[in-house]
Amino acid sequence: TVIMAGVAWSIACQPSTVLWVLPSSDLARSFSSTRWMPILRASPNLNQLIPTGAARHDFAKREQRVGSSTINFVGSNSPANLASRPARIVVLDEVDKFPVESRGGEGDAVNLAEQRTKGFADPKRIKTSTPTEADGLIWQEFLKGDQRRYFVPCPVCGKFVVLAWSPQFTVLAKTGSEAFVRWDSEARRPDGTWDLDRVERSAHAECPHCKAHIQDTHKTLMNRGGEWRPTERGSYGWRSYHLPSLYAATPQTTFGRLAVQFLQQ
């Protein structure tokens, strides 16, 4: 959603050519009609640029002309489409799910897409994905950057913390400000299995500074007061961001539900 909002702003305020690459052509088509089109319609400035009548139906397809901007949604499994479209903004979405055959060699989807920005003085290249493994593309790209984490204020002491899983569950480098997710230690049975109901009821994040229990009801206000901070130097001009679902303030992403999902993996 954040990336879509950023691209929408560019289209409205800084007309651009955009290449949005998804794992497959089918996903690109679906994303265009079910995820992207609602963003355009919700914006009065962008909605007025959408064609009317019969042309509006064709507009929902993978190539769209929005005012002076052009946006193309393509699949990583279509090298010909990737190689023929210059773009100032390239979004590589869910790169860890790109087919193996589209990685490496002449048909490398990531390389082909990034080459499309060469003719622009101020290109933007964005890669995003849910990490799948430590040697996966998105994780390696994150490590090359300045590894920004979202610091939020503790609702009790006000000091900034990072919501995180305990060290034994993650390969992320520690910042020293982690508010680790914890639950009742007695939720683990003598046979090593977990009482998942007890885990869900007791899960919370613990402030490393004042030891306060951070609850789901605190998330919204904490997020509003948060700020992105780099935790490494990274390559010059290379920003990378990590934001786990622990920050999401929805009924599906409570500390308890996420802890249960985590333990069931």
Could you tell me what each predicted segment is?
Residues 1-265:
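Phosphate/NTP-binding elements of NTP-utilizing enzymes
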